[in-house]
């Protein structure tokens, strides 16, 4: 059976450009060479690694520079590194700053840091979204005071696709002297990022057609930071361990492709997603999780729906048998199909949330395949 893969928000298939970059590296004299070595090949590998940093910094924009790019293993490590390292770094500089603010719709790699931070003596406050899944600046303001060290709100939600007002949120955090981090894993490479006022952000290669196992934190040089690992002093002392040059080059190749083709792909994928929404939600048995899908504040290629009369697991298995690969939400927590914490935070009932589906794709999924998917799901729902 030929499968139609519709789980790009979990991980996107590798792009040809990224695969070609890996092949070029493997055939080069620096294949397997440690970029921290002082000999000629080591220095050459280091130059290639720094070149990849520059490409990624340009793709992100926001006046980030190559030295701001800290390579890591992916989004989860990047979020851990950013939040823990920045919170402790800020508090070491100003002991009054012992509060961290998250939103209730963050990825588990952020939310699961709450007990860790509390053990370290921080207070953790949670900002809640409105019914459409957006964190408004007004919801943040009531949580902020001079004790806040760091605010972390994701750029775009990994389940609903709702884009957050990051510019306003960063300004709000800065008014009380707090720094602002955003998890941009779902947004990077798919929409233009407005991050001039963001102090740090997290991205991951495998969401944009790069390899699994590599991501990056982009952090301004002025940001106070306490390293969360110890060893060889790599990544300017912010993340220790020998870097994976092969994956960094493939990451950069995917990022460069996304930057070059961003406008065209955003328009075409948005049009396809809107058609999927309109087709599916014409059924009285299917509802969108948020009305934001029709506007500019929604990720292209993310379709988030609910089928209250059925559970997600049944829907996923029936679609899988028909050759369509979708998910119920974040792949990092999909081993247990309980009601989504994101949808619950939006005020959606548990019964409705248990019937949620996430369909995600980019320009490589054809309109014909999406039409067939819609017809198949409508037949399953009845």
For each feature predicted by the language model, list its residue ranges.
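Pyridoxal 5′-phosphate
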Residues: 1-382
């Amino acid at each position: 059976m030929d499968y139609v893969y519709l789980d790009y928000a979990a991980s996107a298939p590798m792009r040809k450009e990224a695969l070609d970059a890996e092949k070029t590296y493997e055939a080069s004299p620096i294949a397997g060479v440690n970029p921290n070595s002082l000999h000629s090949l080591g220095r050459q590998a280091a130059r290639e690694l720094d070149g990849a940093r520059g490409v990624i910094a340009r793709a992100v924009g926001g006046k980030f520079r190559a030295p701001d790019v800290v390579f890591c293993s992916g989004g989860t490590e990047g979020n851990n590194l950013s939040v823990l390292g920045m919170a402790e770094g800020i508090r070491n500089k100003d002991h009054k700053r012992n509060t961290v603010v998250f939103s209730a719709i963050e990825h588990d790699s952020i939310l699961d840091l709450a007990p860790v931070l509390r053990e370290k003596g921080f207070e953790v406050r949670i900002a809640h979204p409105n019914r459409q899944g957006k964190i408004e600046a007004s919801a943040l303001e009531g949580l902020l005071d001079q004790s806040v060290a760091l605010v972390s709100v994701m750029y775009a939600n990994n389940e609903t696709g709702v884009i957050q007002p990051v510019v306003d949120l960063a300004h709000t955090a800065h008014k009380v002297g707090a720094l602002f981090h955003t998890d941009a894993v779902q947004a990077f490479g798919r929409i233009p990022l407005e991050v001039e006022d963001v102090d740090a952000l997290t991205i991951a290669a495998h969401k944009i057609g790069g390899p699994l196992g590599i991501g990056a934190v982009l952090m301004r040089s002025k940001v106070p930071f306490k390293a969360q690992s110890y060893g060889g002093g790599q990544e300017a002392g912010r993340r220790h361990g020998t870097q994976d040059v092969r994956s960094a080059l493939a990451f950069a190749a995917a990022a460069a492709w996304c930057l070059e083709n961003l406008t065209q792909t955003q328009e075409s994928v948005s049009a396809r997603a809107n058609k999927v929404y309109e087709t599916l939600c014409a059924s009285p048995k299917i509802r969108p999780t948020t009305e934001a899908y029709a506007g500019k504040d929604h990720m292209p290629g993310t379709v988030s729906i609910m089928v209250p009369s059925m559970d997600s697991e049944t829907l996923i298995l029936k679609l899988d048998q028909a050759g369509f690969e979708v998910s119920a939400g974040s792949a990092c927590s999909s081993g247990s199909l309980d009601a989504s914490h994101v949808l619950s935070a939006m005020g959606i009932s548990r019964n409705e949330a248990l019937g949620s589906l996430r369909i995600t794709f980019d320009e490589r999924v054809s309109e014909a395949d999406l039409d067939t998917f819609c017809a198949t799901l409508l037949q399953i729902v009845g």
